């Protein structure tokens, strides 16, 4: 018996076991409303790769099952999000969303990269406003508002030109402290920057839920709206779907796009209502564990 003949069954058994566990975990995450099971919904890209690998080595009678699972996962990952891009004679509003990471070691370099992207509006989470490396960026974008905090919940929305309004809204939760989001208005359109707490325990998961519910009510009341943020939730999560339904907004970030390291999850989102043709460009990874999203909004 050759090494190849012994290795394939050994690999097939282990991949099959892992694939069953992944399939069960993902199915439960879509059915049971519980913060811990919801965590398993975010890893669909990883499950899809696993199912495809299992289909390649599994025994004949199981191969079709994992091929179908991989195909279904791949279709969900590649399913078009939002409205198709359309050409327009009017110039687009360029907005940049970026969770810059509270401990970013190179704020000056990040500022230069953002200036090179030349957005009209920039919204940032986890920004350390005491870091002088952000001063050049703030000077170029003097209008807007921010929530100053020495925590991951610092938040800023800055604009090159005057905004009609900009305010920090504190979402009340049972976690012992409120969490901020920003609501601004420019040219009659509403801009929202969100960063709810991560669901790493039951208390913070409930806080995220309360935060998203309060933000959804504000967003639903607006007419034309652009929402951006690190939502600490993926497109495959029932929590994410509930939020988009309650707020009556459509996601535009591609389902397959990784925006957060080290797990390569898609948790930074752009969502809109009232305009078609929104385009998203993911910028190269810099010094944060997130990547910036450049939004062209007609």
Language-model segments: which ranges?
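N-terminal, active-site-proximal structural segment of metallo-dependent hydrolase catalytic domains
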Residues: 2-137
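Soluble catalytic domains of enzymes that build or remodel membrane lipids, polysaccharides, and related
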Residues: 95, 101-115, 126-298
């Amino acid at each position: 018996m050759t090494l190849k003949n012994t290795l394939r069954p050994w690999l097939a058994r282990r991949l099959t076991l892992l694939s069953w566990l992944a399939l069960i975990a993902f199915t439960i995450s879509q059915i049971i409303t519980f913060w811990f099971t919801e965590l398993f919904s975010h890893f669909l890209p990883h499950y899809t790769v696993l199912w495809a690998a299992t289909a390649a080595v599994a025994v004949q009678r199981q191969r079709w099952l994992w091929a179908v699972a991989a195909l279904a996962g791949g279709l969900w990952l590649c399913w078009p999000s939002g409205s198709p891009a359309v050409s327009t004679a009017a110039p687009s509003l360029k907005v940049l969303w970026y969770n810059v990471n509270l401990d970013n070691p190179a704020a000056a370099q990040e500022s230069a990269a953002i200036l090179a992207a030349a957005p009209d509006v920039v919204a940032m989470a986890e920004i350390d406003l005491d870091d002088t490396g952000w001063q050049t960026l703030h000077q170029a974008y003097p209008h807007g508002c921010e929530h100053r905090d020495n925590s991951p919940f610092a938040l800023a929305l800055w604009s090159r030109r005057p905004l009609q309004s900009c305010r920090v809204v504190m979402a009340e939760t049972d976690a012992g402290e409120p969490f901020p989001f920003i609501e601004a208005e420019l040219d009659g359109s509403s801009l929202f920057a969100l960063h709810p707490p991560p669901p790493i325990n039951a208390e913070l998961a409930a806080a995220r839920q309360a935060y998203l519910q309060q933000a959804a009510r504000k967003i639903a009341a607006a007419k034309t709206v652009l929402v951006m943020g690190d939502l600490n939730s993926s497109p495959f999560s029932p929590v994410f779907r509930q939020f988009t339904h309650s707020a009556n907004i459509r996601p535009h970030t591609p389902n397959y796009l990784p925006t957060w390291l080290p797990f390569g999850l898609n948790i930074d989102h752009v969502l809109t209502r009232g305009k078609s043709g929104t385009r998203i460009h993911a910028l190269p990874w810099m010094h944060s564990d997130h990547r910036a999203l450049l939004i062209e909004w007609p």
